Curated annotation (Swiss-Prot):
This is ATPase expression protein 2, mitochondrial. InterPro entries: ATPase_expression_mit. It is found in: Mitochondrion. Keywords: Mitochondrion, RNA-binding, Transit peptide, Translation regulation. Transmembrane segments: none annotated.
Amino acid sequence: MWINRLVKHPSYSVLRFYTKRLCTVSVKSLREFGVLPNSTICHSVYPRRTYVMGRAVINDILIKKSYSTHTVCAIDRSKDENNGSAYDKFEAKGIPIDVHTLKRIISSSGMDESEFSKSISYLFAKTVDPEPKDVLSLEDLSFLLNKLYTQRFQIRRICRDINAKYSEFWFKLFSLYAEKVDAKRNQVNLRNTKLDACEIFDANLMIKNFIELGQLGKAQKILSFILDRNPDILLSPKNADISTIVHFLQLRCGALAPYWKIPDNSEQKQGFLRKMVRLGAKNTSIRLSSTYKAMDHQTLLKIADLALQEKRLLNSEDLLSTLIQSFGHLGQTQILERCIEHIWQISPQEFPSHVVIKHRGCYPSSKILVSILVSFYFNDHDLHRGLSILDSFIKHYPDVKLDALFWRRLFQLSHFAWTPANDKKATSVVRCWHLMKQWYASKRLRPSVDYETLRQLYDIMKKTGNFPLGIDVLRSFKPGIERMRAENAGKVNNIIIKYQKCIIKELVNRGRFSAVREFIDNYGFDRKMTKDLNIFCANRMFLRSKKMKNKIENKKEREKVRLDSFDDDEDDGMIIGSLW
């Protein structure tokens, strides 16, 4: 197997001028279609920028499932034969792979390597080039890998339908890709050369895929595949690759906040240890790598030193975000504070509001603020320090955009930090809710709906009995909920129905029947849901009346028993008195 042949090879810059393969296949095609100017290929000053732009344009085009004839006519094509053939080849590449072909390829992943290689060749002939090829080139396999990645969600559904292992299919595909890389270097006597930019891009794409699946062990193997062939890809000022550094920090330095175990104070019971939870939505299906806990402290400090000096690294939002999470996971909060102060001039000591702050790196984003918030909570087990720094960011960087993920993490952490014994009404969580509404109102935006945020707020409403909070949530999120129901009604309906039933139950129990009718009229969303809510409301009202009736009858019965016992005592007293 290829994994046994992974050895370290000295090699040179990953960011060198790109290989003949990239120029002839990617950029040349783009030039023929009029997407890039003719001077792009010969431009040797910014090869990395040319490569990234070309790859981005290709991926953007491939995602589009169909190409209309009107679009075809709109493209300015030359009449010569070369441009025509290039366009035809491009048209073939733009067609998505059909379900039958995908099923055949996925089923073949359980076979040996030679049979799987033949199936991949069949896939290439079916979708790109009808001419049969016994052995695919590395360029062809690279294209198929990227194309399959754009259809990964469809592939996952097929794997579920035919009972195939989704992650094993991708790892088998990468095994074939790695063998092609070694075979190419053996043929042209380039065994000691580094991976080129396209090969690094493909490998990082696979790492990203396995991290999304929670298959960190497989992601670690692919990362080793890159590092063994490109030893200077992390710490060289000229050759450092941002995607590889990000994946190294995630896999070797703990910069995967959704997988961190966070103490949940809201579920703590007296005499028991606190429950540990993960922030990720699918935390129960995560398979952590055994090497995930083997943290590389020294390399982290070297990467941080390089990142704080190199402008292109400071401008990377992903790199700074993972760097912050790495320091947070390793408990280096003092270094984290110094990094934040160096890059954005924000410190725990409050600056006067009139001080002008200039950032040295990228403008703070929602992703960076989430990393800061989670990192400090992970070490402090409360939100005081994180919210203090967050408040300074919002004050001195008013254009920062806070997306749905930021508010989701804020509600999760505020919920976990909530201690019911000290705060029965969960005022800290409710305060975060009002903060979110105020921020969206100041930006004149509608709050973006997030399923996990809805779930967190529902738990707070149910535990505290704060049904006005639930009504306020439905009122604020109503336009977004309607959009979500149009896209995927099944998942969002479950949590919305919980809100509705809990609120109706509370209103009925308090005898506010007119408020119940008004609530159903405003938040029924459709006829079927309104009908179901009316039935549920009628049942609750019947149960309430029955309960009240039983309560009155029981009260009368107790009163009657008390009077009877009083009469008996009076008779006994009269008898005893006459005896005396």
